[in-house]
C-alpha cells in the first residue's frame, strides 16, 4: 500500500513539473510572448505579421509545397516558391514546419514578414530571421 501511495505521489510530482514545458509547447503562435518579442519593432499597418520559409525549405517539405501550389499560403515577395502564413492560420492548420518551439513559446522558424491584405506577396520586415530559435 505504501509503495502505491509513494508511486502515485512521485507520478503526480513528475507530471506537475512537466506541465510548464508542455504548456509552452502547446501555446498558440498568435498569443505567444516569444513571437511578440521576435516581431518587436516591426510595423505592418496594411496586413498581418506572418512566418515565412525560404524556397529551398519549402521545396523540401512536401506539405508546404502542396499548400503553396494550391494557393493556400502567400509567397514572400521576390522569392517565388516561398511559403508564408499568418500566425492565426498557422495555429488553425497546425503548420508546425513554420514554427520553432522555445521555452518561452513558439516563434517563427525563419523569416518574419508583413502580408498586406488582398495580395499574394509578403514582405520581410526588420528582425527577419533574427528571432530566438530553438537549438
UniProtKB/Swiss-Prot annotation:
Q: Does the keyword Disulfide bond apply?
A: yes
This entry's Gene Ontology molecular function terms read:
structural constituent of cell wall
- Glycosylation: residue positions: 60
Major location category of this protein: secreted
Give the induction note.
Expressed after 12 to 24 hours post induction of asexual development, which correlates with the development of metulae and phialides. Not expressed in hyphae and strongly induced during development.
What phenotype is described for loss of this gene?
A: Lowers the spore wall hydrophobicity.
Where in the cell is the protein located?
Answer: Secreted; Spore wall
What highest taxon heads this organism's lineage?
A: Eukaryota
Q: Which GO terms describe its cellular component?
A: extracellular region; fungal-type cell wall; spore wall
How does this polypeptide assemble, per the annotation?
Forms homodimers at high concentrations, and these dimers are off-pathway to rodlet formation. Dissociation of the dimers into monomers, with resultant exposure of the hydrophobic face, is necessary for self-assembly to form functional amyloid fibrils called rodlets. Self-assembly into fibrillar rodlets occurs spontaneously at hydrophobic:hydrophilic interfaces and the rodlets further associate laterally to form amphipathic monolayers.
Q: Which family does it belong to?
A: Belongs to the fungal hydrophobin family.
Protein name per UniProt: Class I hydrophobin dewA
Source organism (scientific name): Emericella nidulans (strain FGSC A4 / ATCC 38163 / CBS 112.46 / NRRL 194 / M139) (Aspergillus nidulans)
Gene name of this polypeptide: dewA
